[in-house]
């Protein structure tokens, strides 16, 4: 028995250093590095997924605003109103604020229907879209270039800036707030060098729910609609 105990102790002493060899240490380090690399890859996947979602949201918001322009062009007022959230609002020029999708719809139906010889173009241009980190709200600044006219009767140019808010409901982007600041509204034949027409005020037959939020004058006066975003270079 004593011989066996001595033999076992000798074997233990001979092989004990193997448990602390550099090879074992390297394996442990490799395992630790692999875990760190996997964590980094997971973080990168999450970041890429977020960027991909932002890109999808950007496209959806841009299509939403462009659809608005196309529907307004053809006086499709129900289709236009359907783009708004239930608690959405609309403010055009100095006409005041119409609150709620139902009132937005009623206001739109006070506008003319498309008929022969009528031009009512509202081109949606130059978007700057910012999406909130939570992906549920967004803001967009757009420019509209407009052509109005009735065959052999009248023709006008129009231009202005949108500062809008959007909301994502059940995975679908909708207009939360549409605010259109008019820059000019002029007679086609006189042009903008002869001055402009005044901005239309509130409707008497269907007054707004709230007064105009920002008072301003159209061209030739100077007015800069407030920006929702900071300077992308300076951050100011």
Question: Locations of the language-model features?
Answer:
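Bacterial N-terminal signal peptides that target proteins for export
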Residues: 1-8
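A hydrophobic membrane-anchoring alpha-helix module
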Residues: 192-236
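Beta-strand elements of well-folded, non-transmembrane domains
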Residues: 144-148, 166-168
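Short, surface-exposed coil-to-beta transition loops
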Residues: 122-124, 156-162
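Short beta-strand edge/turn micro-motifs at domain boundaries
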Residues: 137-139, 159-192
